[in-house]
Structures are given as structure tokens and as C-alpha cells.
């Protein structure tokens, strides 16, 4: 029908079978558009199966790197505390910068970015797409 939509996230990687890749696609759309997207994906010859994880318990994480630039010693100590609270890794440290590696839910990553933007003048953020798998017992969105 020519309706357009925007991908929020796209991640592709090999699976336990090296001849098969798994694609995790994140979209925000109305129900009609979402059904259209699923139909389009299912009609592609290379697609083995489309799994809709909208209403099932899942585990989902997104990788993110956040670099805080131009920080002094006190700010670096504060960033270490923030990293501890959020459960993220301090990946690298420079004389006036700190690099954080985050593997959190999209919502938690957004909260971290908002906090860093609020507290520090110069930050650089790189996000990878989310990956998701159906949960065995609990959900982590």
C-alpha cells in the first residue's frame, strides 16, 4: 500500500548454524503497518521464518558505547559511580575522558544517556541494534 515505516533497530548475526543468520528488527508502527511488514518479510525467498516477539516474554539487550569527554578527576570518579549503579563496564579511560560499554535494555540505555547529557557537556554515543530471544521463564525488555 506504499505506507512507509522507520526501523528503530536492525541487528544481524550468525546463529548456531553458520549457514543461517538471525535478524532482529525493531519497529514502531500501528497494527496494520506491522502486519504489512511481517507479510513482506515472509514473502522474501531467503526468509525461513518470521517470529513476532511483541506479546511474548523475551530477553532483549542493546549494546551502546558512551564516551564522556572533557571531564576532570572529580567527574571521572562520578562517572565510575554511575557505571556501578547502571552495571556497565568502564572500557577505557583517558586524561580527560571515560568510555563506557553498556549492554542494557533500550529503556535503561536511554536513561543512562539522559543522565550523562544532563551532567556532562560533551558526550558521544554509538548504539548497536537490539537483540532478542524468547524467554524461558522471565522477561527482560
Predicted regions and their residues:
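Long, contiguous binding/interaction regions
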Residues: 1-22, 29-141
Amino acid at each position: 500500500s506504499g505506507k512507509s515505516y522507520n526501523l528503530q533497530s536492525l541487528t544481524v548475526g550468525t546463529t548456531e548454524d553458520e549457514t543461517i543468520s538471525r535478524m532482529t528488527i525493531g519497529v514502531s508502527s500501528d497494527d496494520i503497518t506491522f502486519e504489512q511488514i511481517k507479510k513482506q518479510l515472509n514473502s522474501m525467498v531467503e526468509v525461513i521464518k518470521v517470529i513476532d516477539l511483541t506479546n511474548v516474554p523475551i530477553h532483549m539487550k542493546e549494546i551502546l558505547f558512551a564516551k564522556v569527554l572533557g571531564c576532570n578527576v572529580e567527574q571521572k570518579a562520578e562517572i565510575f559511580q554511575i557505571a556501578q549503579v547502571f552495571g556497565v563496564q568502564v572500557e577505557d579511560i583517558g586524561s580527560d575522558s571515560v568510555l563506557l560499554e553498556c549492554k542494557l535494555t533500550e529503556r535503561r540505555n536511554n536513561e543512562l544517556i539522559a543522565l550523562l547529557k544532563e551532567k556532562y557537556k560533551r558526550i558521544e554515543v554509538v548504539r548497536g541494534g537490539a537483540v532478542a530471544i524468547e524467554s524461558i521463564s522471565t522477561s527482560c525488555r
